[in-house]
Amino acid sequence: EIADMADINRGTFYLHYKDVFDLMEQIENGLLKELEDMLNHHQAQDLLSRPSLIFAELYPLVQDNADIVSILIGENGDLNFVNRLKHIVREKCLKDWMALKPLRNSNAFEAYYAFIVSGCIGMVQYWLSSGMKESAEELAYMTENIILNGIRVLEKEAK
């Protein structure tokens, strides 16, 4: 079925992939590699002062791959992919944070990280499911604002 949809013959498909699961794994690995490369060229200080710089690159990556990202992190998504994504982001954030501000108690980092990364994944899920009405740049600033200001963001929106 995939070969028909891609307008290739089955032999060509199996020349490149063992099976459908191999195809999916290669797609996932490609996305995660792009994410990791993107994160690695940012300075540790970006995490503290201007997280929107990171998100301004992340959200176009999501936008360019919206169909597959929707499948991977959607309601019936791939938990293994989500966990791999969280691990990559956690390692980068922990390394950068410890370089800037070593922690006496890593529990605080772990709790904050769990909260923020789950919120960011939720933000992507919201954006994709609502038809990506906001631009990637708008969403990047919104995400930064929430990370840096938390619930105070809603106070500004209240009448």
What would you call each of these model-derived segments?
Residues N76-P102, N107-I121:
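Amphipathic alpha-helical packing segments from all-alpha helical-bundle domains
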Residues E34-H42, G119-S130:
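Solvent-exposed, amphipathic alpha-helical segments
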Residues L48-Q63, D67, A114, S118, ...:
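Amphipathic alpha-helical segments that line or abut small-molecule/effector binding pockets
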Residues E1-D22:
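Helix-turn-helix
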Residues Q26, G30, H87, E91, ...:
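Short, residue-level hotspots on alpha-helical faces of the histone-fold
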Residues M5, D22-H42, L53, E57-P60, ...:
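Alpha-helical structural segments
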Residues S118, Y126-K159:
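C-terminal peripheral helix-coil segments that are non-catalytic and often amphipathic
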Residues I27, E34-M38, N65, V69, ...:
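A short secondary-structure junction motif
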